Amino acid sequence: LPALKEHAADLNRINEGVSKAVNEKMKSERFKTELITNVSHDIKTPLTSIINYVDLLEKEEIPNENAKEYLEVLERQSARLKKLIEDLIEASKASSGSLSVNLEKLEAGVFLVQTVGEFKEKTEKNELDLQIKKPEEPIYIMADGRHFWRVIDNLMNNICKYAQPKTRVYINLEQSGEKVQITFRNTSSYPLNISSEELMERFVRGDSSRNTEGNGLGLSIAGSLMELMHGKMQLFVDGDLFKVILEFDRCEVS
């Protein structure tokens, strides 16, 4: 089947991507060891699924409807592996500072509302009540639009995956002196028996989160991107309460 050839090609690209992510821009042997150990767990589930469904497709006399269903599973699991590799490569580049940065003046409130708004369908599906609070007057920051979008995107994906359904998610934009802070606060679906420092480490997630399809790279990438934009990201954990604060220097209105 042509589709199987495509998935075989996907697996080859995945292997190449893993090798590149591990060997390129990563000087810490400890980091490489942790990366291999933890990512192998995330790769195992979709890879096992792909192998099993390929085996089923190789059997004779498979009804077309079943074959279609198997191919859909293969496509979905291949997409998971592709996303993992993309995140690995971005994490490597972000942590090494090799990503290009184009700082420009952005209106934080408008940018925040627009980006968070892209998650309307996901938050409604997870029965999350978004509460966004921001000043009426514009607040400007210096940031890279593409990287800033990715930071918010990663945080919102994290919220959609791990927040307790039927709870409120608070997002607050405020200016404090020469600083601008954006705070994300939500209730986790399980107790966070881990320190905020450990949460910022790549691939460290609570055992309960292994039931989701995340790869644990989102927070690490967001933190590295904030540093590249001369900003700061802080995490706070208290039981099942999870809070992230993004901090930028305030940009003068000209």
Where are these regions (language model features)?
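Short alpha-helical segment of the dimerization/phosphotransfer core of two-component systems
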Residues: 76-81
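Conserved micro-motifs of the catalytic ATP-binding
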Residues: 96-101, 140-143
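Short helix-loop "hinge" at the ATP-lid/N-box region of the Bergerat-fold HATPase_c
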Residues: 159-160
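Short beta-strand/loop element within the Bergerat-fold HATPase_c
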Residues: 166-178
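Short conserved segment of the HATPase_c
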Residues: 191-204
